[in-house]
From Swiss-Prot:
One GO cellular component term: extracellular region
UniProt cross-references to Pfam families, sorted A to Z: Cellulase
Disulfide bonds: 296-419, 321-347
InterPro entries to which the protein is assigned, alphabetical: Glyco_hydro_5 (IPR001547), Glyco_hydro_5_CS (IPR018087), Glycoside_hydrolase_SF (IPR017853), Glycosyl_hydrolase_5 (IPR050386)
Reaction equation(s) it catalyzes: Successive hydrolysis of beta-D-glucose units from the non-reducing ends of (1->3)-beta-D-glucans, releasing alpha-glucose
Signal peptide range in chain numbering: 1-15
Record's protein name: Glucan 1,3-beta-glucosidase
Length: 421
């Protein structure tokens, strides 16, 4: 498909928090603004993350120096043939029809966010990545239709990496902001919008996320904002009114109030917030009351934002103790193993629920419940990160439900109204 040109933007207008409605004549497939999103991410499926599926990386040995740090190096080290063999088996088994059925019928959730890399749709010359994900994505969307679950297609990695995180496909690089890489990303959005934004998917795909977690402080907001605008019009010129999802790029709440508004000629825009409190020593030093106060504060701040907003990633984690959470070869900040951190307390036993004290369990439950309340008060719902892992307890939705840390059903409360909303 030939990429359409970016339409000139309408003049800027002062935006204020209003009750947004879908553009007349458009069909979103989900009533943002009046219906809440209750979802899970299908992390580690089409974009590898070592902390979610460590077994794929541990196959390289016990020495971290010999373990690939991301999917780029995973495929490069194995070569195309072997990488395709291993990953095809992973794609076929990590998420099955049983999972989508359980998400809908057991957990009573209404949406899945599906991270996928640009390489699933279009490779760059010399890319080591392998393809084949698209067929499994299509199969998953068929299961979503069967069980009444909505989906976001989330471009989790773009060429050169938008943040340097391993979950972008390429760790420790920030090479996305050049014309060729951005154009390749737009071409991928054009393809996704033309296929998954078409009428036959309108009842399932209710969001196309242009890029996951672009690191605004590192790559600059000018590049990101221009890409968001061009990506929006690329989706619209593909003939799709599907909601366009933009990530907050790690900016303060209300930063985007005057950006891509209906007054400026944009419509069906959703803002995606990701909230964690474990990726700095200062956050880890907070006690449970301070963690919850931060959650409540974020919820209040977000409640005044202009756009529809979803808290598209968050977790129960109160530590960064999970193996490889900070990356292959990097230990936790909590015990001082991470470069530049300092010892606060031990990680011993944090990954085994059997070793948790009743206080540990109660504090984690309180933290989850506060977030559920805040993300619904401050926004239009939430999507938990992530549905399943091999052994990352604090991040694993299913294990947390099984062990009474995540409420089941999700509206059950042992610690109601912690924020006083």
């Amino acid at each position: 498909m030939k990429l359409t040109k970016l339409v000139a933007l309408a003049g800027a207008a002062l935006a204020s928090p209003i009750q947004l409605v879908p553009r007349e004549g458009s069909f979103l497939g989900f009533n943002y603004g009046s219906e809440k999103v209750h979802g899970v991410n299908l992390g580690g499926w089409f974009v590898l993350e070592p902390f979610i599926t460590p077994s794929l990386f541990e196959a390289f040995g016990n020495n971290d120096a010999n373990v690939p740090v991301d999917e780029y190096h995973y495929t490069a080290w194995l070569g195309k043939e072997e990488a395709e063999k291993r990953l095809t088996d992973h794609w076929n088994t990590w998420i099955t029809e049983y999972d989508i059925k359980a998400i809908a019928e057991n957990y009573k959730l209404n949406l899945v966010r599906i991270p996928i890399g640009y390489w699933a749709f279009s490779l760059l010359p010399n890319d080591p990545y392998v393809q084949g994900q698209e067929a499994y994505l299509d199969r998953a969307l068929g299961w979503c239709r069967k069980y009444g679950v909505k989906a976001w297609v989330d471009v989790h990695g773009v060429p050169g990496s938008q943040n340097g995180f391993d979950n972008s496909g390429l760790r420790d690089h920030w090479d996305w902001p050049n014309a060729d890489n951005v154009q390749h990303s737009i071409n991928v959005i054009n393809y996704i919008a033309g296929k998954y934004g078409a009428p036959e998917y309108n009842d399932i795909v209710v969001g196309i996320e242009l890029v996951n977690e672009p690191l605004g402080p590192a790559i600059g907001m000018e590049v990101i904002e221009k890409y968001f605008q061009e990506g929006f019009w690329t989706v619209r010129h593909a003939g799709s009114d599907t909601a366009v999802v933009i990530h907050d790029a790690f900016q303060e709440k209300n930063y985007f109030n005057n950006f891509m508004t209906t007054e400026q000629g944009f419509w069906n825009v959703v803002l995606d917030h990701h909230q964690y409190q474990v990726f700095s020593p200062g956050e880890l030093a907070r006690n449970i009351d301070q963690h919850i106060a931060e959650v409540c504060n974020v919820g209040r701040q977000a409640s005044t934002e202009y756009h529809w907003r979803i808290f598209g990633e968050w977790s129960a984690a109160l530590t960064d103790c999970t193996h490889w959470l900070n990356g292959v070869g990097k230990g936790p900040r909590l015990d001082g193993s991470f470069p530049g951190s300092y010892y606060q307390r031990s990680c011993q036993g944090r990954g085994d629920i059997q070793t948790w004290s009743e206080q540990d369990k109660q504090e984690s439950r309180r933290y989850v419940e506060a977030q559920l309340d805040a993300w619904e008060h401050g926004g239009d719902g939430w999507i938990y990160w992530t549905y399943k892992t091999e052994n990352a307890l604090e991040w694993d939705f299913r294990r947390l439900v099984d062990n009474g840390i995540f409420p089941f059903p999700y509206w059950d409360r042992q610690f109601p109204n912690q924020c006083g909303f």
